C-alpha cells in the first residue's frame, strides 16, 4: 500500500483506509509520505482508539462552517510555535482536566469530544478563543509558522509501531546530505514523523541527530522508494511484492483552478506543483522501476484507488478547505471509493468484509 501526501483532503485517504479495515483487507507493506504518514499510523497504531474510530474521528478535526467562513484557518491542527505557546497549552490542559463536564485536553486529544456537553460549533469557538490568546515566539527570523504537531503523541501509540503487522516506511528529505531518507517501523519515533510532515514554511525543519529534515512529500509525493531495487544490495527494501495499491490525492488536474480569495491562492500555490510531481512520479515508477529490463513486462501489478471520482462537480472549489463539511464529505467519498475498490478487486486483495458501519 502506497499512501500519498496531501491535506486537508487527506480525509479521502482516511475514508478509504476505514473501508479497507471494514472489508478485512490487510497489507504486507505500507509506504507513506506527508499527511499519508499520519493516516497510515492512525490505521495501524492509534492511541486509545480502534483504527476505524481514529480514522473516522480525523474527519472531525475540520472547523465548523459558520466559523470557517469568517476565519478560514484550521487553528485546531496548526498551533502557534514556541516555548511560551507550549507552556500555555500545557497550562490550559491542566485547567481543563480539573473542570467537570469537559474532556481531558482540547489541544492534545484531537480525536475526542473535547467539550462533552457543548455543541460542535461551541467547541470550535472555544478552540478559536484559546488559540487567539496563545502567546507565540513567531518573528521574522522564524523558520516556520507553526508548532510541530503538538497532539502527535496523544494520537499515535509509538510503542506499538515496531510491533505492527505490516512493514511500514516513511520518508523525509535530509537538507544536510541533500537526499531522501527512508525510515522503517523499527526506526520510527515521534521525531521522525514530525520530520516527515515538516512542510517548508508551515513548519521549521525537524532536527534529528544534528541533521535537518523537511517533508518528503514536498519532493516525492508518493514514496515508491521501498519498492525500487537498491543498487548497492540488489534488492528492494520492501522485498518482493506482487501488487501495489496506490492512494493518491494530489495527481488530479482538477485541483488546479482559479482561487476564490487570497488565502485560497496561497493554498493552491502549494498544491499546484505537487499535482504534476505526483503524476510524473507515478509514470516514472511504472515506466522505469516497474519493468522487467529484458522483457519490458510489468514486475508487479499497480492498482490505483479512484478516490476523487465521487467528489461532486460543484464541490471542487472547496476540496482544499479545512471546513467540517468538506472534511466529512471527503471521508464519505473516500469510504465509498474504498468499498467499491475492495468489491472490484476483493479476490486479489483477500477481502473479508467485517460488520463495521460507516459513521463520520
Residue ranges and their predicted role:
Residues 26, 72, 240, 298-301:
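Short loop/turn motifs at secondary-structure junctions
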Residues 147-154, 192, 226, 333, ...:
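Amphipathic alpha-helical segments that form well-ordered structural scaffolds
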Residues 147, 282-360:
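C-terminal helical/tail subdomains of lipid-metabolizing enzymes
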Residues 157-169:
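A short alpha-helix-loop-beta-strand transition element characteristic
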Residues 131-136, 207-211, 314-320:
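Flexible glycine/proline-enriched surface loops and loop-helix/loop-strand junctions
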Residues 26-27, 165-167, 239-242:
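A general structural motif
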Residues 2-6, 36, 170-294, 334:
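Conserved catalytic block of serine-dependent lipid acyl chemistry
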Residues 7-140, 146, 152, 185-195, ...:
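Patatin-like phospholipase
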Amino acid at each position: 500500500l502506497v499512501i500519498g501526501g496531501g491535506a486537508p483532503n487527506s480525509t479521502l485517504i482516511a475514508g478509504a483506509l476505514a473501508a479497507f479495515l471494514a472489508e478485512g483487507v490487510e497489507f504486507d507493506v505500507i509506504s507513506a509520505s506527508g499527511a499519508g504518514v499520519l493516516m497510515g499510523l492512525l490505521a495501524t497504531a492509534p492511541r486509545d482508539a480502534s483504527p476505524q474510530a481514529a480514522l473516522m474521528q480525523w474527519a472531525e478535526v475540520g472547523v465548523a462552517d459558520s466559523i470557517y467562513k469568517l476565519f478560514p484557518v484550521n487553528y485546531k491542527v496548526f498551533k502557534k510555535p514556541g516555548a511560551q505557546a507550549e507552556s500555555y497549552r500545557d497550562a490550559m490542559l491542566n485547567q481543563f482536566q480539573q473542570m467537570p463536564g469537559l474532556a481531558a485536553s482540547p489541544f492534545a486529544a484531537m480525536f475526542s469530544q473535547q467539550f462533552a456537553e457543548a455543541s460542535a460549533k461551541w467547541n470550535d469557538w472555544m478552540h478559536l478563543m484559546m488559540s487567539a490568546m496563545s502567546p507565540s515566539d513567531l518573528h521574522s527570523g522564524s523558520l516556520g509558522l507553526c508548532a510541530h504537531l503538538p497532539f502527535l503523541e496523544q494520537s499515535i501509540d509509538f510503542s506499538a509501531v515496531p510491533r505492527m503487522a505490516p512493514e511500514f516506511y516513511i520518508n523525509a528529505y535530509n537538507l544536510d546530505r541533500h537526499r531522501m531518507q527512508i525510515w522503517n517501523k523499527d526506526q520510527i519515533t515521534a521525531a521522525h514523523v514530525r520530520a516527515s510532515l515538516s512542510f517548508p514554511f508551515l513548519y521549521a525543519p525537524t532536527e534529528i541527530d544534528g541533521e535537518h529534515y523537511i517533508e518528503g512529500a514536498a519532493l516525492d509525493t508518493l514514496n515508491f522508494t521501498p519498492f525500487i531495487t537498491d543498487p548497492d544490495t540488489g534488492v528492494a527494501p520492501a522485498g518482493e511484492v506482487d501488487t501495489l495499491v496506490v492512494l493518491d490525492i494530489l495527481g488530479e488536474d482538477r485541483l488546479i483552478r482559479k482561487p476564490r480569495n487570497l488565502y485560497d491562492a496561497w493554498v493552491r500555490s502549494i498544491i499546484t506543483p505537487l499535482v504534476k510531481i505526483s503524476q510524473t512520479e507515478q509514470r516514472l515508477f511504472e515506466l522505469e522501476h516497474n519493468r522487467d529490463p529484458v522483457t519490458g513486462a510489468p514486475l508487479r501489478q499497480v492498482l490505483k484507488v479512484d478516490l476523487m471520482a465521487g467528489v461532486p462537480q460543484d464541490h471542487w472549489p472547496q476540496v482544499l478547505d479545512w471546513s467540517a463539511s468538506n472534511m466529512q464529505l471527503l471521508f464519505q467519498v473516500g469510504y465509498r471509493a474504498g468499498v467499491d475498490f475492495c468489491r472490484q478487486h476483493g479476490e486479489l486483495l483477500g477481502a473479508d468484509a467485517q460488520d463495521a458501519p460507516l459513521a463520520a
